[in-house]
Structure formats: structure tokens, C-alpha cells
């Protein structure tokens, strides 16, 4: 297939792309999730929300329904994650119990979305991979992810209202109140670039168009 040109899209992969990958000349672009080593032909792609895992998996339906009627948030910070997905998550919940909403128990997806909607900010530590579904669920619900600074993530989320911190210990009520403008921006942000047809078309037009 050396005479054919390719644009490659990857998704649902936690293994990061590193500098060891060899890209053939006829590959115009690789749009990849968790592309920690990106640049040149390799561009970061959103990890997005979880795909349907079975015919009865209705989480996407619940998310789309929740997105159509998002109430005003009444609380400041929501903390709900699996403590065992990555060492960065260990002990985080205990840091915020005194003033944030901390969920220790597993809850159904509808309750989770309702909880997201009731908070302006959501703590989003990395999971098994550097990017995770939680980050994008929070944005789709027009809330603000609180994320640890990372060059890859900061490139990926450049156009979106994210509160970046060097350490989660830096997250305080005062810091969140000072960054309330991010919550206001989230109410107005354009989510259309995160729909698959628009995302695909943008990449194809940019890279295929530039190469005839």
C-alpha cells in the first residue's frame, strides 16, 4: 500500500505513544489518544467518553439526556474516583473531606451525572492512562476539571476551561472561588468540536487537504 495515503485515528488505548514509533512516509497523520510523545505527524486526540460496552449499556443515553437540561451548580468541588487506578490517586480523597463532596461508594451513572451537575469543579486525577473518560464527561456536563499540569494534557485541553494545578494540595476553596470565571466559561463553550463527525472532518481536511 505504499502508493496510498493514510490518516490514522486511534482510541480506547491506555498505552501511551512514545518516541520509538516509526511512521511510514505515506502516513499523513496519526490522531492518537494518550500520545504523550506528540508533534510532527502525531497529534493528540480526545479520549472521550466510554463506548457502549454491551447492548444494554445506556450510559451514553443518560449523558446525552443530562446534557440537555443541566441545572446551575450549587456546590464547589466534587471528588469521586477509583483510588486504585493509579498511585497519584492514593490518599487524595482524605485531603478534601473537610470541605468538598467526597464520594467513597460506587454509584450508578445517573447519580454520578447528577452529582457532577451540582458542582462547579471536579477533581480529575489521572487514571490508568494520562487521559481518561472522566475529564471529558466533566466538560460535556459544562463543569470544570481540576487537573495536574502536564505538557500533553495542557496541549490537548488548550481550548477548554480547565483549572491547572502543580499539586492537588494546592486546591483550596479560595483557589476555586478565584477561578469561578472558568465555570462561567464552561457554560458558554462550544462542544461541537468534540462530536466525532466534526473532529474527523477537521483532521481530514487539514492533513489530506494539505497533501492534495
Q: Where in this protein do the model-derived segments appear?
A:
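Nucleotide-sugar donor-binding catalytic core of glycosyltransferases
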Residues: 1-163, 174-210
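Short helix-start
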Residues: 168-169
Amino acid at each position: 500500500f505504499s502508493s496510498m495515503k493514510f490518516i490514522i485515528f486511534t482510541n480506547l488505548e491506555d498505552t501511551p505513544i512514545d518516541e520509538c514509533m516509526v511512521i511510514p512516509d505515506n502516513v499523513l497523520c496519526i490522531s492518537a489518544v494518550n500520545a504523550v510523545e506528540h508533534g510532527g505527524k502525531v497529534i493528540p486526540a480526545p479520549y472521550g467518553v466510554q463506548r457502549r460496552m454491551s447492548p444494554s449499556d445506556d450510559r451514553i443515553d443518560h449523558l446525552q439526556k443530562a446534557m440537555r437540561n443541566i441545572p446551575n451548580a450549587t456546590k464547589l468541588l466534587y471528588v469521586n474516583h477509583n483510588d486504585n487506578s493509579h498511585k497519584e490517586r492514593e490518599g487524595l480523597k482524605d485531603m478534601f473531606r473537610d470541605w468538598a463532596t467526597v464520594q467513597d461508594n460506587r454509584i450508578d451513572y445517573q447519580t454520578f451525572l447528577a452529582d457532577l451537575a451540582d458542582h462547579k469543579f471536579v477533581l480529575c486525577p489521572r487514571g490508568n492512562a494520562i487521559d481518561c473518560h472522566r475529564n471529558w464527561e466533566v466538560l460535556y456536563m459544562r463543569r470544570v476539571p481540576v487537573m495536574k499540569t502536564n505538557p500533553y494534557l495542557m496541549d490537548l485541553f488548550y481550548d477548554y476551561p480547565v483549572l491547572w494545578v502543580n499539586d492537588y494540595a494546592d486546591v483550596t476553596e479560595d483557589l476555586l472561588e478565584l477561578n469561578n470565571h472558568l465555570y462561567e466559561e464552561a457554560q458558554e463553550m462550544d462542544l461541537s468540536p468534540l462530536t466525532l463527525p466534526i473532529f474527523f472532518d477537521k483532521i481530514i481536511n487539514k492533513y489530506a487537504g494539505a497533501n492534495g
